[in-house]
Regions:
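Bacterial N-terminal signal peptides
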Residues: 11-23
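Acidic/His- and Gly-rich active-site-bordering loop/insert found
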Residues: 33, 37-156, 165-186
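Histidine/acidic-residue-rich, glycine-tolerant segments that coordinate divalent metal ions
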Residues: 146-155, 161-162, 178-300, 310, ...
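Metal-dependent amide/peptide-bond hydrolase catalytic core
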Residues: 262, 266-565
Length: 565
């Protein structure tokens, strides 16, 4: 923000400084209840309070930039390992802001890092968020029913188009304050590449991207604004492709001369189904046939099946993998084929998040609060909820006052995964959930794309950027936060657990994934790229009236403004 802007907002700054100065110190957690409770009030450092107040105003002044980044990445709609338009756009933006750019890191062509340092360069804060989309999730934003932009095309059905806006705007604001006030530190921005394939972050760790990092602040879209600490409740995951080799023959003329690799693949899948009954209820496992042969009249000489193995932790997940290898060998024996290769395509440890960093961030969540949704936002949310036969309670309006802690092992019942776990077991890490999506949706679905280039996404990302900026300032100016984070990391989190990567030295990023899908749809997707020089919003470019819902869920007009916190 230009210095003259501060003069016009002096009264707001004064009020914000008073608010921060009166705030309690970071909350202390009670391990026995897994809920953080307030500690006795302690005023913030006046300098930190002033900087935080300024940061809130500066982030708010960049609401337009948040909207443009969110909408631009939504319009690219790229799948994992093919995020090249996103790379070009983001790195160009950050280079103009003075960040040093490195592309193709960790052997991943679509990956990148952006770094900026001042003074001693310490502490180093890494800021990450995923960028990849979901196959067949194309849908027009702001439309509360199925209406693809590109039929069969990919889309942001996980909402990964919004998190980079949170990090970029927060980083630009904090960088300006660091320069002006001569605050030492390093900002390292990076994307979560191919998160849906769980195939990016472990390779970033192996490449040493975070070797100098003090704290990682990760962001992920949600329908609330919050953070948690301890065991995340996510599953560990190992992604592996089993490739079989046999010999071809005429499927009708001389089938007895062939050894069908496809038969082996099908037997492996069936064998896993029989074994599934005798596995823990908490495990999750799924597979698809990636290569089933070329045509029916040729006995397939090669075929492959791609598995996701999920369990509570590294040992249990590896045990599933070992079972899978035994079943593969059995399938090969039954079909007189061979297990040609077993490639680990990706992986993710079950995440464990830093309590001290979460405590600092939670206090900032309370300060920022949820966005002010208007009637149009709520109408869209209730419209898609009703469309999917979910409870139509609309958007959440309150943040959780309690800081939730570690999930107890006996209550763990399995679920999804996120490869942020590999980073979290190497450096103190938290994930900020920011409210750019709608509650009650299925996830990994076209419905989850509907809000992601609308005022809901813009307001949610702006709130996230405010929390992120405030937490970065806590880390920069309160050495105890970093010291406590590493004390927790060494003496609690990793006291009895040693990180061992799932990926082996011979495993490389499977950057070929999704190339064929993107090649198929690229020319159609390009027609929908956002042009912010011609249109204020992506909705305007698409000619979509916000919100568009089925008539029975439309509500009377009310306040259609607001959105500022």
């Amino acid at each position: 923000m230009h210095p003259t802007r501060f003069c016009s907002t002096r009264s707001l700054l004064t009020a914000l400084i008073a608010l921060f100065s009166a705030h309690a110190a970071p909350l202390s957690a009670q391990d026995s209840t897994q809920v953080a409770s307030p500690s006795p009030a302690a005023p913030l450092d006046p300098r930190l309070a002033k900087l935080k107040a300024e940061a809130l105003v500066m982030v708010e002044s960049r609401a337009k930039q948040v909207q443009e980044i969110v909408d631009m990445l939504f319009s690219f709609q790229e799948l994992g390992f093919q995020e090249f338009e996103s790379q070009r756009y983001i790195t160009t933006l950050l280079a103009k802001e003075g960040f040093s750019i490195e592309k193709g890191v960790a052997g991943i062509p679509s990956a990148w890092t952006a770094k900026w340092s001042y003074g001693t360069g310490k502490p180093e804060i890494s800021l990450g968020s995923d960028v990849d989309g979901i196959p067949q999730a194309s849908n027009k934003p702001g439309v509360g029913y199925r209406d693809p932009m590109v039929s069969g095309g990919p889309g942001h059905g996980e909402g990964h188009n919004a998190g980079q806006a949170v990090n970029i705007v927060a980083a630009i604001v904090v960088k300006q304050l660091m320069q002006r006030d001569k605050i030492s530190g390093t900002l390292l921005l990076w994307p979560g590449i191919a998160e849906e394939q769980m195939a990016g972050k472990a390779f970033l760790v192996r490449a040493g991207i975070f070797k100098n990092t003090d704290v990682t602040l990760f962001t992920h879209v949600s329908n609330d604004l919050g953070v948690s600490w301890g065991a995340s409740g996510s599953s560990a995951l190992l992604s592996a492709e089993f490739r079989f080799r046999g010999s071809s023959a005429h499927a009708a003329g001389a089938p007895w001369r062939g050894q069908s690799a496809l038969d082996a693949v099908m037997l492996m899948g069936q064998g896993w189904e029989f074994r599934r009954e005798h596995l823990r209820l908490q495990q999750r496992s799924h597979y698809v046939i990636k290569d089933g042969g070329d045509q029916p009249n040729v006995v397939p000489s090669t075929a492959s099946i791609w598995f996701y193995f999920r369990e509570q932790d590294y040992p249990r997940t590896m045990a599933l993998f070992e079972i899978g290898k035994k079943i593969a060998e059995g399938a090969a024996m039954m079909t007189d084929t061979k297990v040609d290769t077993i490639a680990i395509l990706g992986s993710g440890w079950s995440a464990h998040f830093s309590k001290p960093i979460a405590q600092a961030m939670h206090a900032n969540v309370q300060t920022v609060g949820m966005p002010k949704w208007d009637d149009k936002d709520q109408t869209l949310a209730k419209g898609i909820q009703k469309e999917l036969n979910s409870p139509d309670f609309g958007l959440s309006e309150q943040v959780n006052k309690e800081l939730r802690g570690a999930e107890t092992p006996q209550n763990w019942m399995g679920g999804g995964s996120d490869d942020i776990g590999d980073i979290a077991w190497n450096v103190p890490t938290i994930t900020l959930r920011f409210p750019s999506n709608i509650p009650g949706l299925p996830g990994h679905n076209w419905a989850n794309a509907i809000s992601m280039a609308t005022p809901i996404a813009h307001k949610g990302a702006l709130a996230g950027a405010k929390v992120q900026a405030l937490t970065m300032l806590d880390i920069m100016l309160t050495p105890k936060v970093v010291a406590d984070a590493w004390d927790y990391f060494r003496n609690v989190q990793t006291k009895d657990v040693k990180y061992t990567p799932f990926i082996r030295l011979q495993d490389t990023p499977p950057t070929y994934l999704n190339a064929d899908i993107m090649a198929k749809y690229k020319s159609q997707l390009q027609k929908f790229y956002y042009d912010p020089t011609k249109f204020k919003t992506y909705l305007e470019q698409l000619g979509i009236e916000y919100p568009t819902v089925r008539a029975q869920v439309a509500q009377p007009k009310g306040n259609d403004g607001g959105g500022k916190q």
